[in-house]
């Protein structure tokens, strides 16, 4: 919303009032005031004010959300409309107060490790560079085993499997059955198309994601193990709770959550 600040000088020109196409600005107690019921947020008043006394105020989370899923309840608090949300996590990283969080599964992972279950971490290739310059692939694997993981598998192997199958799918269907094919790897993108562009949903490849390919490969080798996906994106948590995926990926951790586990355990990559 646009708001008139205390810097309003009650100038004789009243430029803000003159340029407003809806007559939403009036003089109240020696200062211009915007009627929110009339304001259309065109911004003309802010541009016309010679004192820069009118500012645009927007919630960082709402500004970051490309789905317009951030709304306000009756008390003015921000709420997430789950019918619009695609779990992309942009609101989460944009909130300067840390007021938005994704559902964590650190407790469940630690409990599985403490109960001596075989826990396998499948890690997105983006782990390189996430934990400082001392974090080489070899040191990262050692650090994961220090946390109690039995094995570490790179999801790059699943990405290769995904690429091969998706390429075969593309050659078979485009352009014989459809004009184009969109990738299937990102669950947030998948959900966005389903909600905003349902007519194009059938053009998304039905190939499994690298995470699922890797998880199923691990489960095939050891059906009783617990698979933990570790990556940069919170949207993977949405993917992992899907009915057809739930048995493949037991838990999901973000790199941020994994960093918290490293710190709690006292893991120092420089000392490994």
Give, region by region, the residue ranges found by the protein language model.
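Iron-sulfur-associated redox domains of electron-transfer enzymes in respiratory
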Residues: 1, 102-272
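Flexible, acidic/Gly-rich N-terminal and inter-domain linker regions that tether
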Residues: 1-3, 9, 26
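Generic N-terminal leader segments that precede the first folded domain
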Residues: 4, 21-24, 137
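Short strand-loop junctions, especially beta-strand C-caps/beta-turns
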Residues: 7, 37, 124-126
């Amino acid at each position: 919303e646009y708001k008139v600040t205390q810097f309003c000088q009650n100038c004789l020109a009243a430029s803000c009032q003159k340029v407003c196409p809806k007559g939403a600005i009036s003089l109240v107690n020696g200062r211009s005031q915007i009627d929110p019921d009339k304001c259309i947020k065109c911004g003309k008043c802010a541009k016309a004010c010679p004192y820069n006394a009118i500012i645009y105020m927007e919630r960082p989370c709402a500004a970051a959300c490309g789905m317009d899923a951030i709304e306000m309840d009756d008390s003015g608090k921000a709420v997430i409309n789950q019918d619009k949300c695609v779990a992309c996590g942009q609101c989460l990283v944009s909130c300067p107060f840390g007021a938005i969080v994704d559902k964590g599964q650190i407790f469940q992972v630690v409990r599985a490790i403490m109960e001596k279950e075989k826990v396998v971490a499948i890690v997105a290739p983006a782990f390189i560079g996430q934990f400082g310059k001392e974090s080489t692939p070899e040191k990262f694997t050692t650090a994961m085993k220090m946390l109690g993981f039995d094995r570490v598998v790179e999801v790059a192997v699943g990405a290769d499997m995904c690429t091969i199958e998706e390429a075969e799918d593309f050659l078979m269907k485009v352009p014989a059955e459809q004009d184009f094919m969109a990738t299937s790897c990102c669950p947030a993108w998948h959900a966005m198309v389903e909600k905003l562009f349902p007519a194009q949903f059938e053009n998304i490849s039905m190939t499994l994601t690298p995470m699922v390919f890797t998880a199923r490969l691990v489960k095939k080798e050891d059906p009783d193990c617990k698979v933990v996906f570790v990556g940069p994106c919170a949207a993977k948590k949405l993917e992992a709770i899907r009915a057809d995926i739930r048995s493949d990926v037991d838990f999901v951790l973000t790199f941020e959550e994994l960093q918290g586990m490293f710190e709690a355990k006292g893991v120092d990559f420089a000392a490994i």
